[in-house]
Amino acid sequence: MSYQEAKQKYAAIGVDTDAAIARLKTVPISLHCWQGDDVRGFDTDPNKPLTGGIQTTGNYPGRARTPEELMADIDVVLSLCPGTKKINLHASYAIFDEENPWVDRDKLEPKHFRKWMDFCKARGLGADFNPTYFSHPMCDPLTLSSPNEETRRFWINHGKACIRISQYLAEELGQPCTMNIWTGDGFKDVPADRKGPRDRYRASIDEILSEPYDFKLVKPCIESKVFGIGVEAYTVGSAEFALTYAAYNRDKCIPLMDNGHYHPTEVVSDKIPALLAFFPEIALHVTRPIRWDSDHVVLLDDETKEICKEIVRCGGLDGRVNIALDYFDASINRISAWTVGFRNVQKALLSALLTPNDALRALQDEQRFTELMVRQEALKTMPFGDVWDEYCRSCNVPVGTDWFETVQKYERDVLSKRV
């Protein structure tokens, strides 16, 4: 079917496909740098084990080993993905050289991310940022909740440094910077004290957010998690803790939900409208959990589509929902992992924009539930793919799976030589 034919079919149900395409082009999605090197970073031994209850599996050849390689890989992904992009950085991706020699995480400065800023500015990209509270000798294994004052002070200073870096990135790039605070602090077995670590965690975040910043430019987030490897019994930053902290401090931070950080029977799609009933702004990490926070590559599955439906229906595209990707798969080609996930979130958003949401809402309000089911099911066989192809063409990126040929050539010419 041609795009014009698909356009007519959608017009028959009250949907303007041209308007949907134009709207989607303006929606920024933050591409996570850590897929490219399996979350290793550049500030400590790249062969160190991951800590914080997270794990990368696989050893597919071609992992980025230097900032230059990582940026080159990201450039390939950018050329294959439609829409507006940001780059999401972790503090462990600081770039050190003769002019700016290595410093520890509590001493990081904006200059250690100048090359990332230049990279983004040259491509018209925004940037988001994350303090890195894992895979470091100062994890004891706790960080911001540690009873050890020296440990806690180190990580508080790291968080304050990251506030300054986020402010720098936002000012230089002219776009708000979401700065996400997440730690893997917790215990493997039943703790004797659940409140003490949370009191310390709260005090630590309070001190981090006392660092001056413009809340219109820097959006500190508090992210929760249900459990991780080695912290099965208790997580300091639980869902209740993180959400309550954000609600209590809504003048200086926003909540962030990662759809892999909840019990497997919970769905973030249902939480989005609940939070937007109270918060003017929230943030999301979109991933694909399989039985736990496994961070598989995002597919065009039911929950991804439901998440994007709620973003669109709740007015999230008007600056109320900050969307970022967060997954890491080392068992497949990393360029493909990035590209598949990014394009799938875009597909899910486009599908939501091609839904006659006002008409469906009216059916629900009028309690015409039989017709609502019929109309919703009919949408599943609409010619969405033809509209998606037109969107890709209008963004000057490959249509269908044509992009994979570029990835295969890049693997032959570049990635295969990284040995």
What spans do the regions from the language model cover?
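Structured alpha-helical segments in the cores of large, soluble enzyme domains
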Residues: 71-79, 119-126, 159-175, 200-214, ...
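Short, amphipathic alpha-helical segments
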Residues: 110, 145-160, 195-202, 236
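Alpha/beta catalytic barrel-like cores
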Residues: 1-147, 154, 164, 175-177, ...
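Acidic/histidine-rich catalytic cores of soluble enzymes
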Residues: 188-303
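Short linear capping/connector segments at secondary-structure termini
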Residues: 184-186, 225, 327
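Active-site groove signature of glycoside hydrolases
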Residues: 166-192, 218-219
